[in-house]
């Protein structure tokens, strides 16, 4: 089998933090997920590798072994990765991994040994515009989900005939003795199910399910943000007993060219020409719900902020709203003509000593420095 590096598979640095590993796993698992790459053997293989890499690198003990000794170090301790295991076994492992990545929101019922060969909960990304996320919307989506094969009743075996796994005796675990220590690991033959398929179901080729599609209209609440999860009850995969999991929509929000969001607060850069600074002014600025009047006092500093209470994003869990923060950005001309130069020089002279603050500020400093070297 072709060797591969776990860090390269997840496209991360070897110094990556646990959070970075989790984020990279989620990205790569979504990229190569079987629901997105139907019939692609290359994506199937990459999906296995991504999960193998995550199982090792997300475990501090396994990661230290791998960093120091490579895969040989893992194998010497009884960790066999996905060697000799089928694709459905890999997919079944996603239950525990999804729990760690998405915060434990996925049902554990779908991972019982008597359940189907796949997690009943379904996750997919949902792209939203800035406006859709701020104000909420109705969204038409198409989902692809698994339904238990009617011929084998979701077992994957011809006529539903299942045998006890001879390697683990139905326990789902095998034991490896190393010196005085005995380690238990998931049976590589049955993937922990304790069962074996002697002859595959011809209709589903042993998968235990068939793929289906469904169009849905989902309600997006006001105030959702990137990485928020929206749960749609009973719209996930369907198990062999008719039980259906939940659909989890992982939100991705497009950035806006003018407004910048941070939590429920909105930031807006307000360009202010330099000649206006000593005078002050009143401006009309855009807000999420229309326009606001911003009074800028004389001698406002660059990056100074003005806060408009309750003009931000409505909190997704309550009626409370964030703030709009208008931040001044002083703008200078890229170039000036002769007439403008003359006017500026005349203006500077009109301030007298005040127009040359550096002269008074450095008074006596030059003589002091000369004294250091005399």
From Swiss-Prot:
Pfam family, one: DnaJ
InterPro entries xref list: DnaJ, DnaJ_C, DnaJ_domain, DnaJ_domain_CS, HSP40/DnaJ_pept-bd, HSP_DnaJ_Cys-rich_dom, HSP_DnaJ_Cys-rich_dom_sf, J_dom_sf
Domain annotation J: ranges: 5-70
Localization terms from the record: Cytoplasm
Primary location recorded for the protein, binned into one broad class: cytoplasm
Keywords: Chaperone, Cytoplasm, DNA replication, Metal-binding, Repeat, Stress response, Zinc, Zinc-finger
GO cellular component, one term: cytoplasm
Amino acids binding Zn(2+) 1: 149, 152, 201, 204
Domain of life: Bacteria
Annotated positions binding Zn(2+) 2: 165, 168, 187, 190
Domain notes: The J domain is necessary and sufficient to stimulate DnaK ATPase activity. Zinc center 1 plays an important role in the autonomous, DnaK-independent chaperone activity of DnaJ. Zinc center 2 is essential for interaction with DnaK and for DnaJ activity.
Chain's role: Participates actively in the response to hyperosmotic and heat shock by preventing the aggregation of stress-denatured proteins and by disaggregating proteins, also in an autonomous, DnaK-independent fashion. Unfolded proteins bind initially to DnaJ; upon interaction with the DnaJ-bound protein, DnaK hydrolyzes its bound ATP, resulting in the formation of a stable complex. GrpE releases ADP from DnaK; ATP binding to DnaK triggers the release of the substrate protein, thus completing the reaction cycle.
Subunit record text: Homodimer.
Protein name (record): Chaperone protein DnaJ
């Amino acid at each position: 089998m072709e060797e591969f590096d776990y860090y390269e598979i997840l496209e991360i640095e070897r110094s990556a933090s646990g959070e970075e590993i989790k984020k990279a796993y989620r990205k790569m698992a979504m990229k190569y997920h079987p629901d997105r790459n139907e019939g692609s053997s290359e994506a199937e293989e990459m999906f296995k590798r991504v999960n193998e890499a995550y199982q090792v690198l997300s475990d501090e003990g396994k990661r230290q072994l791998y960093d120091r000794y490579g895969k040989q170090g893992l194998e010497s301790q009884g960790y066999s990765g996905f060697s000799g295991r089928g694709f459905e076994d890999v997919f079944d492992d996603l239950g525990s991994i999804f729990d760690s990545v998405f915060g434990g929101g996925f049902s554990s019922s779908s991972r019982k040994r008597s359940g189907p060969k796949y997690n009943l909960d379904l996750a997919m990304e949902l792209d939203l515009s800035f406006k859709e996320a701020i104000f909420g919307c109705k969204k038409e989506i198409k989902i692809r989900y698994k339904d238990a094969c009617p011929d084998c009743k979701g077992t994957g075996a011809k006529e539903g005939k299942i045998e006890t796994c001879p390697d683990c005796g139905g326990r789902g675990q095998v034991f490896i003795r190393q010196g005085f220590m005995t380690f238990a690991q998931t049976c590589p033959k049955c993937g922990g199910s304790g069962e074996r398929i002697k002859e595959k179901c011809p209709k589903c080729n042993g998968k235990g399910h068939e793929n289906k599609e469904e169009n849905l209209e989902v309600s997006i609440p006001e105030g959702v943000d990137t990485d928020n999860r929206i749960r749609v009850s009973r719209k996930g995969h369907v198990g062999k007993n008719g039980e259906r999991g939940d659909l989890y929509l992982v939100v991705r929000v497009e950035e806006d060219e003018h407004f910048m969001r941070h939590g429920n607060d909105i930031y807006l850069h307000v360009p202010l020409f330099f000649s206006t600074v000593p005078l002050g002014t009143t401006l009309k600025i855009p807000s999420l719900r229309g326009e606001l009047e911003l009074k800028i006092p004389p001698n406002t500093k660059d990056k100074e902020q003005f806060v408009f209470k309750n003009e931000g994003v409505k909190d997704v869990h309550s009626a409370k709203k964030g703030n709009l923060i208008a931040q001044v950005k002083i703008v200078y001309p890229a170039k000036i003509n002769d007439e403008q130069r003359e006017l500026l020089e005349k203006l500077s002279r009109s301030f007298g000593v005040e127009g040359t603050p550096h002269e008074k500020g450095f008074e006596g400093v030059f003589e002091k420095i000369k004294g250091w070297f005399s």
